């Protein structure tokens, strides 16, 4: 079991804090320790409910990186419940719930094409999706599926090089 705990702490970059008092850790560090606790039991599926709530942007980014790594490198299925639509961008599949029912589902690209419907149920689209849609509506870029800063940069850089 010590080996599994060691490996779990290493997976979430918290090995250096193994002997730290919990009250001395930041919110993001506590979340990573909680995830490590789940990893130590070697689950096939990990369910995270608002895992990034009340974290600063850097803490949120760290948790999302860890979640992505768990899925891609360790093959763990991660079910992530979140109210932050920009977090859903990293998912393979998104299920949008409204009043306890499935409103719609699909890939992030499919779901975020439905910005008007998302807003009707009081959900936002990720900022890059909103920027993308505004730029496309203004004719500045062609309609595309860019959802992250990197993807948007890939769309905009060729245009800037033409100027």
Regions found by a protein language model. Name each.
Residues 2-17:
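Conserved ABC ATPase "signature" region
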Residues 21-25, 29:
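Conserved ABC ATPase signature
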Residues 35:
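Hydrophobic anchor residue at the start of the ABC signature
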Residues 105-106:
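ABC ATPase "signature
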